[in-house]
Amino acid sequence: MMSGKSWGYVVQFFCLLVFLGMSPLLIKMDGRKTMSVSSDSVRSQNVSDEVKPVVALTFDDGPNASSTPILLDGLKERKVRATFFLIGENVEKDENEKIVKRMYEEGHLIGNHTYTHCNLSKLETGEAKKELEQTDTVIEKITGKQPVFVRAPYGELPVDSEQDLNRIYIGWTVDPLDWMTEDAGAVVKTVVEEINPGDVILLHDCYPSSVQAAIRIVDLLQGKGYEFVTVDHLIMD
């Protein structure tokens, strides 16, 4: 479960970007204590130049054996790729490994959400590292790739996150607090009213109402001309 505190992109990988031959992304704080990518980012797109506004749809706390496949069906039908931040112990439950394999094969981005959904900021460095590495191992076993992108539970980063150049911590800019309600309509309303180009939407695929809301959000925003991308494309393109 999330605290509801909205925080945006946490970009702590300047050296990694230099290594990849890309200019570092500039970041700034806005009045809501969220971090937003500056004018070099997708938020600076001139939509009037016939460039589609883009947003990223992200899901935490999965996979869930019953609700996640329904979500994947809806996204596939609409040709939408999303980003899933997975809890390691959930991946290992039941038949969930098959769901993760499907996510990967259908082009979704898979990220790390720790092994037990712990507050990384309250753990010793070694314990926090273990939480992340356990989930890395579980995901890599299925996809063949170690996740680079991380969403810290509750938005609370580990104490040494600035030194961890192998990970990119991703936050959010639109949080409808879907885990607090079963009213899918209310979730949809919040997202549609708050959305702007370049936003990162936070939802949870473990709740049926959130899955219903996600599909309706996709339909409404696609109708408004939005394109959905994974977070790597949002911050690196």
Feature-to-residue mapping (PLM):
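Active-site beta->alpha N-cap acidic-glycine motif
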Residues: R32-S121, E127-A128, V138, Q146, ...
